[in-house]
Amino acid sequence: MQEIFNRIFRDNKSIYTLSENNKRVYGEKIIRKKNSYLREWDPRRSKLAAAILKGFKHANFDKKLNILYLGASTGTTVSHLSDICISGRLYAVELSYDSFVKLYSLSQARNNIFPILEDANLVERYKFFVEKCDFIYQDIAQRNQVQIFNQNADIFKPRSAILIIKIKAISSKEPEKKILKETISSIRKYNIKEIIDLRPYDIGNYLVYMER
């Protein structure tokens, strides 16, 4: 077992996050490590885990990082970022009430997760909840996903960000590479540092890492 990034460990084809919490979030394997735990990070349940296993180089997240997570769903990836950014805050925005109920339950067991039941299109409604944002992570399957990202980035001005580009949500007719190129060209005020095709874990989705 080797630590490959801050609080992220790898053992052959599996990766884990170092956690102070031994409660399972989605049925993942947990290994005891002295006074802490290692939670297995499933690449088929988390696009960030898939990207790391595909060689993503910018996953050394600071433990004090404050993250605005757009499209948090039930909190699978949020929970692992909570392990990593143990001294930071995760502002997790989710619109679906059913998903939010599980996300809220997760936040009750982790004091660095702040769930927000809101539409990420309507940043004016939740911007006052977010005290500080160093990083945006967005995973939203909507046609206007880049517009959502640009609106939030203009308000919060994080130094760096991850955008999951969901090709089929934008168009199911145009060639994938054409959509990817056009989508990336629509991102404002950021320099693209890394693009990861998430195959075979996730078909038709790309992780884009960028910095100001």
From Swiss-Prot:
The keyword Transit peptide does not apply. The keyword Zinc does not apply. SMART domains: Fibrillarin. GO terms for molecular function: histone H2AQ104 methyltransferase activity; RNA binding; rRNA methyltransferase activity. Its EC number is 2.1.1.-. Pfam families: Fibrillarin. Coiled coil: none annotated. It is an enzyme of class 2 (transferase). Keywords: Methyltransferase, RNA-binding, rRNA processing, Transferase, tRNA processing. S-adenosyl-L-methionine binds at residues 76-77, 94-95, 119-120, 139-142. GO terms for biological process: box C/D sno(s)RNA 3'-end processing; tRNA processing. Involved in pre-rRNA and tRNA processing. Utilizes the methyl donor S-adenosyl-L-methionine to catalyze the site-specific 2'-hydroxyl methylation of ribose moieties in rRNA and tRNA. Site specificity is provided by a guide RNA that base pairs with the substrate. Methylation occurs at a characteristic distance from the sequence involved in base pairing with the guide RNA. HAMAP family: RNA_methyltransf_FlpA. Belongs to the methyltransferase superfamily. Fibrillarin family. Interacts with nop5. Component of box C/D small ribonucleoprotein (sRNP) particles that contain rpl7ae, FlpA and nop5, plus a guide RNA. This is Fibrillarin-like rRNA/tRNA 2'-O-methyltransferase. It comes from Picrophilus torridus (strain ATCC 700027 / DSM 9790 / JCM 10055 / NBRC 100828 / KAW 2/3). The gene is flpA.
